[in-house]
């Protein structure tokens, strides 16, 4: 069967075990997900913490609507992320780039000063200083020209 944490404490005490308490750093630290609504709330909290860390490091996100940054993404200074930008996997963004709107990158490397508008990328490399035209799809070992 399934037990809630409060049930487990009671059962342990009834068996003669010791129980104690500890203080959580925040109310968010003890939240759980028993349904889709609670899971969505936990996801919102996690995404917010990741976004806040990048904002404090100099990433500009003028409108966070639809901006999702994965936990393993690295972003250089002075990068702008526009609405609908989703960065996943081991994606790395060099400094002074503009991504979005509606750019989705997974496991990509974007060089310094590049501009990507409505680009889909998976495992690709964007050389520094590139302006990738809207609706470009890059997969696998695709690489932009250095020119």
What are these regions (language model features)?
Residues 1-147:
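Left-handed beta-helix
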């Amino acid at each position: 069967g399934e037990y809630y944490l409060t049930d487990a404490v009671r059962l342990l005490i009834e068996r003669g075990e010791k129980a104690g308490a500890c203080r959580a750093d925040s109310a968010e630290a003890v939240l759980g997900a028993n349904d889709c609504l609670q899971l969505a709330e936990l996801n919102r909290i996690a995404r917010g913490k990741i976004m806040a860390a990048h904002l404090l490091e100099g990433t500009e996100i003028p409108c966070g609507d639809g901006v999702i940054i994965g936990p393993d993404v690295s972003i250089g200074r002075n990068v702008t992320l526009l609405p609908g930008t989703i960065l996943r996997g081991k994606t790395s963004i060099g400094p002074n780039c503009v991504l979005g709107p509606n750019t989705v990158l997974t496991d990509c490397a974007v060089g310094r000063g590049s501009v990507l508008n409505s680009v889909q990328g998976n495992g690709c490399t964007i050389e520094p200083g590139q302006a990738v035209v809207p609706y470009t799809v890059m997969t696998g070992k695709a690489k932009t020209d250095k020119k």
